[in-house]
């Protein structure tokens, strides 16, 4: 039982935001057209508000785009689906990367993608089965985005380390090399976040392990994004996407010339600054869980 609780904590909390979400949200199939929510979009460098169309034009020019989400907000996934559908209309999409897919799933992703080129009639449950989709990511939230990316002509790539690697890092923490990504201020901010998410009930070796897992996930996402065909789009949790503590710092360590554009999907009332992202799209908070 104790081992099971530790594993649950590692998988669900080390990614800083993964949670069991309501299943009564986004429809699982990819729609032919998605209307996005009436939120507030801001250019964080100029402070100017943008329309969704203005944002789309700006994002279309990015060679590497990171979209940060709050995992349990259904409107964030609706926006992501809208981006997948509409960025492709502005220019060919080079690749899409998802935090929700791990390295070991890539062969299955490739097989399913090739199969879907034949446009078969297929149930969502069958796609989940073939992908070995992880139940921690509710299909009701992610099904539309995943199906859209699978049916698109561009590659769909994993952006997360395997579960066995998570367990190895927990037992023997090791950190990526780099000045920017492992700076004391960055690690202190991540530790503070991890402690807060555990209600203050984490310290010592367990905290070090959780920090190592988070930073190795960030490093892997950065490596995947840098090697992906461009224009590349990475969808991940907000902490991974953040310029101040996440993937962009690892990209700077690995390839200083690479400058990803970051769009943070947030909820009204959150404080998002230009240190964290280039653009922010505010929507209503996710309904409280019952």
Annotate each predicted stretch with a short phrase:
Residues 2-21:
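Gram-negative bacterial Sec-dependent N-terminal signal peptides
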Residues 21-290:
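Compositional signal for N-terminal targeting/processing segments
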